């Protein structure tokens, strides 16, 4: 394919967007020698920076990420350009990992971008149903206050484009601000944090290498611990790491955003718990038995109690937390309610000696 100037390529795709499928644009971009531009000719700030040093080289933004699925279901780990991307994920839906039936929150039909559509009891959000001309976003129905909050987002479509992100934000985030701009919406300001499918973590307009890429079929877990003030991400139910600290006394909404045409994400788990002794015990049990399929197996507990713990705190008991440690806030910065678990016994002992 002959090389086009930046402006001519941009006009070509803008004028033909309504007539051509997304994969046709992907093929056109794949044949071009200038990578990193979306179909509108705007630069993809997520794909332009060097990737995490241990990861493969950056791929063109129009090519979906493959090989990162939670399961091995057909079609989750491969992408072809002979058919449209819409057709690629229109077949039999994968339900792997979708065991939960009760949800603490779903997507909010009243707080979303115009280029979104909800389905599956408002648990699945589809972005840019025909073609994309910017960035669409949505938030959950519940403001996350005190306690422990955990949710999982499953990528139910090919993952590609300038950005597809999972994260959190305050009520000050304008979800429709960039509906005509291709960008990484979550993390552009101090009111939000976003994990990009490219593996970059965004906050205050800055981005850092945080994880490997994720693609269709990937399950991204998010744990907001308002007791320690931490935000932790999981990929395919394995801990990636702590993304933010000192989040005590703040309230957030779960959020996602996408620039990709015909893309979609689904809430497959959303739960909350108070920071109770019951939670702390389950948390510690999981740390002591990180590789156990059933954390409570073999423990001398009544069957009824085991069932209650599984129902209320199953997400704690099932997570891979080999590297899941809540950081201790620096001295003088933590609030009284956010003291580390490790320092409290020492403080009580000192009081007894005095």
Swiss-Prot record:
InterPro entries hit by this protein: B30.2/SPRY, B30.2/SPRY_sf, ConA-like_dom_sf, FBXO45-Fsn/SPSB_families, SOCS_box, SPRY_dom, SPRY_SPSB3
Entry keyword Lipoprotein: no
Top-level taxon of origin: Eukaryota
Residue ranges constituting the B30.2/SPRY domain according to the UniProt record: 85-274
Cellular component annotations (GO), alphabetically ordered: Cul5-RING ubiquitin ligase complex; nucleus
Pathway assigned in UniProt: Protein modification; protein ubiquitination
SOCS box domain ranges (all copies): 264-315
Localization (cell): Nucleus
Keyword Kinase: no
GO-annotated molecular function: ubiquitin-like ligase-substrate adaptor activity
Gene3D superfamilies, per database record: 2.60.120.920
Entry keywords, A to Z: Nucleus, Ubl conjugation pathway
Domain comment quoted from the record: The SOCS box domain mediates the interaction with the Elongin BC complex, an adapter module in different E3 ubiquitin ligase complexes.
Classification via PANTHER family: SPRY DOMAIN CONTAINING SOCS BOX PROTEIN (PTHR12245), SPRY DOMAIN-CONTAINING SOCS BOX PROTEIN 3 (PTHR12245:SF5)
Family designation: Belongs to the SPSB family.
Function according to Swiss-Prot or TrEMBL: Substrate-recognition component of a cullin-5-RING E3 ubiquitin-protein ligase complex (ECS complex, also named CRL5 complex), which mediates the ubiquitination and subsequent proteasomal degradation of target proteins, such as CGAS and SNAI1. The ECS(SPSB3) complex catalyzes 'Lys-48'-linked ubiquitination of nuclear CGAS in cycling cells, leading to its degradation. Recognizes and binds nucleosome-bound CGAS: ubiquitination and degradation of nuclear CGAS during G1 and G2 phases is required to promote low intranuclear CGAS abundance before the next mitotic cycle.
Name of the protein in question: SPRY domain-containing SOCS box protein 3
Organism of this sequence: Mus musculus (Mouse)
Lineage: Eukaryota, Metazoa, Chordata, Craniata, Vertebrata
Gene from which this protein is expressed: Spsb3
